[in-house]
Structures are given as C-alpha cells and as structure tokens.
Design a protein with these regions (language model features):
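Juxtamembrane regions of bacterial inner-membrane/periplasmic proteins
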Residues: 1-2, 11-19, 26-369
C-alpha cells in the first residue's frame, strides 16, 4: 500500500472514555493484493472523517455516522465493538451510475456514459457465538444508457472467450451460426428451468439482485468459500467482457456492466444471448450443442426433466461432467432436479400433470460413442 497521507487525529480523554476526532485523506492510493485485483489498484482519493469513542472500562469502541469518500463517491460509516459482539454499516445514497466507472479502471468501460443513480446499504453484525447477520439492500434508480457502445449486442456479434484451459473460443451469436437457437425456439419448460435455478428474479431486477447478494456473502462467510450470487445478466457480463480471476474489483465491474446491459438490451435478448454462450459441459457452448451432447436430440425435443438437468450443471460444467461420463445421475442429484420441477409447478411454469409425469421420468443420457 502506498499514497500520500494528510489530516489530523485529535484525542481527548475523560475518565475511562477516549474520543478521537479523525479526518484523514489519502491521495494517489495504490494497493497491490490478489483479492483486490489482478493488477495494482489505484484510487485518486480516499477520505475518512468522524469521531471514534473508546470506553476502556467496558472495552468498547464505536463510531457513528462517520463520513467516507472513495474517489468522489461519498457515504456514511458506523461501527461498534463491545463484549456482546461487533457490527458495522455502510450507507451510500444516490451515487450517479456514471461515477462508478471511475473506481474500476478497466478498458471494457471505454465509451461508458450512463444516467441514473444507485442507493446501497451494507450491514454486518455478529453477537457471541451466533451466526453473523449480513445484508445488502439497495435500488438502481432510473438507469439509462446514453452511449451506444453496447448496441452491437442487439444484432449478431462475434463472441470471444478464453476457456479455463486458456484456449480461445470464438463463434457468432446469431444468424450465420447453425448452432444458434433463437429464444422463441427454446421450450418454455427449458427456459424456466434455467431461470428458477439461476435467477428467479430475472424479470424483476435491473441487472443485479441485492437479496441474492446478501445470501451469497452470508454463504461465503459461513462456509469460507466463494459463491458468486450472480444474476443471469451478471453472468453474461462476466462471459462477454471480463477475465476469469476471482477478485473484488472483477465482481464490482461485473455489477456495473450488468446494470448497463439490463438498461441497453431487452430481457428477451439477454436470455437469447445467455442460452447461446453458456458453457454446459467442457467445451460445449450453447443450448443446441448441450442438447445434442447430453441427450442426442434437438432443443425442441427436450423434456422438463432434461431441461432441469441442463439448468443444474450451469454452475459447474467441468465439475459436474462426471455424471455424464458415468452414464448416470445420483439419487441426490435427481432430488435436486425434482426440486427445480416443483418450483416450476408452484410458480405456474409447469402444470401439475406435467410435474407428476416429469418426476416419474427416468433421466437417460445419449449413448457415448
């Protein structure tokens, strides 16, 4: 970490209380850490101002409504630590979406010009041995893409991707690619199997789902491993524009791009792109190739159970491929497929009779050559 620090700390002690009036700013902040970004992160300006109060007798520390500024984006910060536990809250109101790009430093935002705001509040608390409580709430307010930089995605475009083996993948998404499937030709039960499994709020959110973010971070804290919590739109952003590394800034870039994509493209076009660029098995891109790879049939012939299976492997096309290689699916996995089908039935995307017929069906892969 490097940068130029300026400011003051005034300390006042009264009995067992120690209060510190703090106003610290850092210009030209440089941070190198693999969890932050794959390259050194540079922030033009950071400022923290507020009062921190410590009670030596009670062994407590708190700061309320302190002010923070990150590159011109302002918010408030509160925190408390005592013998009952620890908590903090960050509140950022009405940040212009056009300002967010200044924090991420990436060529994929060339030509980025956006209108609208975002409100965001992050809270965390943990008392004793209880599970930590984490929440992310917010709202994207009237997002509007001013530039036309993503309009090319409304037409057939060339998809370029580097797979997990660092091999380039390139194909046209649209007419000119015989494997391309227009959304209207994907059965509703396949479409909704993926939506309820990957992003149930797809048609309601504006690219990002704050509730799912909270659930993902809570899982990450509890299980001490990464779970993305990405919407379908975020997954599109990641596949179209970003590197594969897992860093905080890559996730932040993904969020900004998802908001931009949602404001630029129709939900129908987003789904059409998604179904045609997703990797469903090692080296198997697009729903058409996936249908032939797993079941030896065209997309329109897929059953609800087969659609549920395709939805279930999206999070791990390499990790879950052993089932196809073994030629069978475990009972536990079948239970998961039935859960997806049940959600589809309860949400009106599968009739009760279709649900009953589907849970009776045996999942059969195509014979391997």
């Amino acid at each position: 970490i490097s940068g130029t620090v300026d400011g003051f700390i005034n300390i006042l002690r009264k009995s067992t209380d120690i209060s510190a009036d703090i106003d610290i700013s850092v210009k030209g902040l440089n941070i190198e850490h693999p969890l932050i970004d794959w390259q050194p992160y540079k922030l033009s300006f950071f400022r923290f101002s507020g009062v921190a109060v410590a009670d030596i007798g009670k062994k407590s520390l708190k700061s309320e409504n302190s002010k923070i500024s990150l590159g011109g984006i302002d918010g408030s910060f509160s925190a408390k630590k005592d013998d009952t536990g620890v908590s903090f809250a960050v509140d950022i109101n009405k940040v212009p979406l056009n300002k967010l790009e200044t924090l991420v430093h990436n060529d994929v935002f060339k030509g980025y010009l956006f209108d609208g705001d975002i409100d965001l509040k992050v809270t965390y608390s943990k008392e004793g041995d209880a599970e930590p409580v984490f929440s992310v709430t917010g709202e994207v307010v009237e997002p509007l893409q001013i530039s036309d930089r993503l309009n090319y995605l409304k037409e057939p475009f060339l998809f370029n991707f580097i797979d997990r083996n660092d091999q380039p993948v390139s194909f046209v998404v649209g007419e000119g690619n015989r494997d391309f499937i227009a959304l209207d030709y994907i059965p509703e039960h396949v479409l909704w199997a993926v939506i309820v499994s990957e992003d149930a709020g797809f048609f309601m959110h504006k690219g990002i789902d704050f509730e799912e973010m909270s659930a993902a971070v809570k899982d990450n804290i509890k299980k001490k491993k990464m779970r993305g919590g990405s919407t379908i739109t975020q997954q599109i952003a990641k596949n179209l524009f970003l590197k594969r590394e897992r860093t905080l800034l890559r996730k932040f870039r993904e969020v900004i791009l998802a908001i931009e994509l949602d404001a630029t493209l129709s939900k129908k076009r987003l789904l059409e792109i998604y179904f045609n660029i997703v990797e469903w098995a090692p080296g198997i891109f697009g729903i058409s190739n996936a249908a032939w790879y797993y079941f030896g049939k065209p997309v329109y012939m897929l059953t609800p159970l087969e659609g549920a299976y395709l939805a279930s492997v999206i999070p791990g096309p390499y990790r879950y491929n052993y089932q196809f290689q073994n030629g069978k699916v475990s009972e536990k996995w079948i239970e998961n497929l039935h859960r997806i089908l049940n959600i589809m039935n309860e949400t009106g995307h599968l009739t009760f009779q279709e649900y009953i017929d589907s849970v009776k069906e045996e999942l059969l892969f195509r014979p391997k050559e």
